[in-house]
Amino acid sequence: MEIDKRLIVLLKRSADEIKKTVIGKDDIIIKILMTACAGGHILLEDIPGVGKTTMAVAFSKALSLKYNRMQFTSDVMPADVTGFYMPNRATGEFDFKPGAVFCNLFLADEINRTSSKTQSALLEAMEGEIGRAHV
């Protein structure tokens, strides 16, 4: 019961901190916090210029999360999202270079503008298939 009360206090403080930056979106803030607690993914669809990126940055700051943003375009490759192995000449081995999804909060902007292979790589990462072998 004590943990539940502490979680509620923490979520309220986080919501209050986010509301200092994001005005008039109280219901969305609560829904995003609930989804984050459940370990889910969030899809924000809206017209340009209404503060989706600002909201993501506010969340990352309020919750002390590592934040990455990627603008998806036709030239973004799957490895940009998920990472890749690069040869290390000094050791003769391959070093993993993590992609943009290796963070706590990842904002994928304009997903529809990229190739289907890159979209598939993003969906695999969202399903948790990417990263298990790398961490």
Predicted regions and their residues:
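Conserved small/polar residues in nucleotide/adenosyl-binding loops
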Residues: 133-135
